[in-house]
A protein has these predicted regions:
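Extended serine/threonine-enriched, polar tracts that run as long, contiguous segments within proteins
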Residues: 167, 173-176
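Short helix-loop boundary/capping segments
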Residues: 137, 142-148
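Glycine-rich NAD(P)-binding loop of Rossmann-like domains
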Residues: 150-161
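Flexible glycine-rich beta->alpha loop in the catalytic core of nucleotide-sugar glycosyltransferases
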Residues: 143, 189-190, 196-197
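A generic "structured core" feature
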Residues: 174, 180, 184-186, 190
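Short acidic, glycine/proline-rich loop/turn micro-motifs
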Residues: 147-150, 217
Length: 252
């Protein structure tokens, strides 16, 4: 049952922590399970690169209400490792599936409702990156393909997402994806290659397959700046653009 004061599942939270973490870390309950979550865990572990404390990972907590509460969520770890550098949030309806793989998440990474993270090899998502609802991050094709020349390529690869990335809703990141810092991926895009050759401070990727459509764009991550910009447009309804000051910060 749900513990009414904090609205998390006490029993599932205890099971996950003491199955995945050393005892001295598990007693802090760094992983908190919310909502209607199915647990499938075997021979797996979580490694903390930060000090253990309550609620570093909030799994299936509905914080933006793109999905109803409780939407079914899945935490599946078999022979898997999750490395955590700081706070991470998975909203309701998310699937986290690590099977013979390593998933490393930077500080303040956030997955909105319905996201699927499928890791069979290696996925590394750096700090402050955010995934909008219904995104898929998958480092495997699951099945092998026999080519005309008789060769068969490996079906697994790696995915690397840089710092402060914003992945639009319903986007798919497949094996081979490498995104630099301050990247925006437009909604419903499909990405499966490296964009690390771009040295501009911010790129915008869109389409299927994903292509760079604009350089120099960055998501405004600062909540304070977003409030200022929103207030400006509410007051100046006839104005289409807001001009940033020279000392403007995209994130804080």
């Amino acid at each position: 049952k749900t513990y009414r004061k904090y609205h998390f599942h006490v029993w599932k939270t205890l099971v996950v922590n003491f199955k995945l973490l050393p005892f001295k870390q598990a007693i802090h309950l760094p992983i908190v399970i919310y909502g209607k979550t199915q647990l499938i865990i075997s021979n797996s572990s979580v490694k903390l690169l930060c000090s253990p404390r309550f609620g570093i990972v909030k799994f299936a907590k509905n914080h933006e209400y793109f999905y109803p509460t409780p939407a079914p969520s899945l935490l599946f770890m078999i022979n898997g490792t999750m490395v955590l550098e700081g706070d991470v949030q998975f909203s309701s309806g998310c699937t986290l599936r690590i099977n013979d793989g390593i998933l490393q998440l930077g500080e303040n990474v956030c997955f909105s409702g319905g996201c699927k993270i499928l890791c069979n090899n290696r996925i590394f998502i750096r700090a402050y990156s955010q995934f909008a609802f219904d995104c898929v991050c998958c480092d495997t094709n699951f099945h092998y393909i026999l080519q005309k020349d008789g060769l068969v390529k490996d079906c697994v690869g790696i995915i690397e997402v840089g710092n402060r990335n914003w992945i639009g809703n319903s986007t798919t990141l497949m094996r081979g994806t490498q995104l630099p810092d301050n990247t925006i991926v437009a909604s419903r895009s499909f990405v499966n290659k490296s964009f690390l050759g771009y040295h501009d401070d911010g790129i915008l990727i869109a389409g299927s397959p994903g292509k760079v459509v604009r350089l120099g764009d960055q998501r405004v991550f600062s909540a304070q700046k977003e409030m200022e910009i929103r207030a400006f447009f509410k007051k100046s309804k006839m104005t289409e653009m807001w001009l940033a000051e020279s000392d403007f910060f995209f994130y804080e």
